[in-house]
Every structure is written in structure tokens, then in C-alpha cells.
């Protein structure tokens, strides 16, 4: 349900995403750690986009072409997953992990600011 509106067309490997797309779409979420943290910390961040970003980060691998910048900085997929998990737990949003492929509910309910 949530991922359907955020599916991106496949791009040739090696093509660089535009900066705006890199910042705003789950396909390229996490290309810049500082930007990812800024987006996840916004109080007006919507539940469905937060789930999409957290799912993308949880499934990201350091060898992926979408996280080339992380590879240059030495960022590992495990660190990305941990950061996504911490952000989701603070906001009370479920996160889908690659191993379980199911939503893990956090204790508190997500409340999006209008």
C-alpha cells in the first residue's frame, strides 16, 4: 500500500540521480547521511513516506549503486539499518526488516503533525 505511490522507474546502473530526487525519494534515500537525518527528524514527516524511507534504508546494501556516496564515506549497510531503526523507534513507526519481511510495531502510535 505505502510503497506503490513511491515506486521509481528503473534507471541504467551508473546514472546519477538528480539532487532533488536523491533527497526526496525512497529509491535514493540515504545517499547523504546528513540529509537523511534531517528528513527523518522533521516533525511533519508523513507516516507513509517515513515507512518507505525506513524500509529502503533497512534493505540497502553498501555495494548498491544507490548508495555510492556511503561507500566513499565508508558507511555500511548495518549502520544505515541501525540509524533507520532508531529514527523509527523515536517516531513510533513500524519498520520492515530484510530478514523478517514484516512490519514490526513500535509501542507508541505514530502521530503526524498536520
UniProtKB/Swiss-Prot annotation:
Tissue: Expressed in kidney and liver.
Region (Disordered): 1-24
Name this polypeptide is given: Putative uncharacterized protein ANKRD13C-DT
Species per Swiss-Prot/TrEMBL record: Homo sapiens (Human)
Taxonomic lineage from the root: Eukaryota, Metazoa, Chordata, Craniata, Vertebrata
The encoding gene: ANKRD13C-DT
